[in-house]
A protein has these predicted regions:
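Short beta-strand segments
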Residues: 18-20, 161-163, 170, 190-194, ...
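Beta-strand segments within the central parallel beta-sheet cores of soluble alpha/beta enzyme folds
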Residues: 96-101, 133-145, 239-241
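Glycine-rich, charge-dense phosphate/pyrophosphate-binding loop(s)
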Residues: 229-323
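Acyltransferase
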Residues: 180, 184-262, 266-267
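Short, small-residue alpha-helix embedded
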Residues: 115-130, 278-284
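ATP-binding N-lobe of GHMP and related small-molecule kinases
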Residues: 2-109, 123, 127, 131-133, ...
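Alpha/beta catalytic cores of group-transfer enzymes, especially the acyltransferase/condensing modules
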Residues: 135-182, 272, 282
């Protein structure tokens, strides 16, 4: 059953901000590709942060569909740690704020939940306090905060959630990431089964080293995918969507994957992959009609409980923003 995910309570605020869900890796680009998505319904599928007021003490109220998955003590929250990290980066004291986080992404889902909270918080603080940090400085701050959660600094969730689009990470480049072309008719179905798989646990099963043969194959397949996007060769891009690094190690954690992939292939779905570290899966579809079939199939065969959600999405063009 496809359920509504966005729960935005009606309450006063000074400014309201939003950051979308994201899919890290996008199968072929482990730690190097990430895409931000938004439902075609217009629903907000991501976290919303309200700056409610300036006051004497920093305070955070938690609400939203997945608030029950967060630590009960709001002082142990990424939004507050981002405020202090932002303040430390500026090197000066900032006015304290009353904040409200609408947690509408599930935790440990493979949808960039921690990155989403980090991005919406850092974006909000930078905007509210007059944009003292450049986009590059802000993205670096986001990635450092994300590294504290996942165990390693990587940009493939924070970059797309911040900028939108399908982003290619650029190691050792001042630019950090670059938006890639995308096929406008593509739709992506995101299916979260309602179970939790922490990023740290999912990374723990990965190989510590890759053989020379596998390294060449990985680089070649990613190059093939990027080249196909720039050439607007859809068939070649789909053929290149092969996860040679993470999926072989993570499939034992997601035993339904092979059968679901076979079932969706019968419906003509272009590709089924693991969203980030999982357990969310993403189905790449050629159009809205195919996406509807894929969504119904995944909701029927992969959703496990009331926390589950299935969303038909398009690429998010804008990323984080004020509402």
């Amino acid at each position: 059953m496809m359920q509504q995910t966005s729960e935005i309570i009606q309450a006063p605020y000074l400014k309201r901000y939003y950051a979308p869900a994201s899919t890290g890796n996008f199968s072929v680009g482990f730690d190097l590709l990430g895409a931000a998505f938004e439902p075609i319904s217009g629903e907000l599928f991501g976290d919303v942060l309200d700056i409610v007021a300036e006051q004497a003490e920093l305070e955070l109220e938690l609400t939203g569909r997945y608030v029950h998955q967060l630590p009960a003590d709001s002082s142990d929250n990424l939004v507050l740690s981002c405020f202090y990290a932002f303040e430390q980066t500026l090197g000066r004291s900032l006015p304290r704020l009353a904040l409200r986080l609408h947690k509408n992404l599930p935790v440990g889902s493979g949808l960039g939940s921690s990155a989403c909270s980090i991005v919406v918080a850092c974006y909000a603080f930078n905007d509210y306090f007059g944009k003292p940090l450049s986009d590059n400085q802000l993205l670096q701050l986001m990635a450092q905060a994300e590294g504290g959660v996942s165990g390693s600094v990587h940009y493939d969730n924070v970059a797309p959630s911040f900028y939108g689009g399908l982003q290619l990470m650029l190691p050792d480049s001042a630019q950090l990431c670059r938006a890639l072309p995308w096929f406008a008719h593509w739709r992506v179905v995101l299916c979260y089964p309602g179970t939790v798989l922490s990023t740290k646990a999912a990374r723990a099963v990965l190989p510590k080293q890759l053989s020379l043969t596998l390294s060449i194959a990985f680089a070649g397949m990613l190059s093939r995918f990027v080249s196909a996007l720039y050439s607007a060769d859809e068939a070649e891009a789909v053929a290149a969507l092969r996860d040679l690094v993470a999926e072989p190690a993570r499939t034992p954690l997601l035993p339904e994957l092979p059968a679901l992939r076979a079932g969706l292939a019968e419906l003509g779905v272009l590709h089924l992959g693991i969203s980030g570290a999982g357990p969310t899966l993403f189905a790449l579809c050629h159009n809205d009609a195919q996406a509807q079939l894929a969504a119904e199939y995944l909701a029927r065969h992969y959703e496990k409980n009331q926390d589950a959600t299935t969303q038909i999405c398009r690429l998010s063009a804008t990323g984080a923003r004020a509402l």
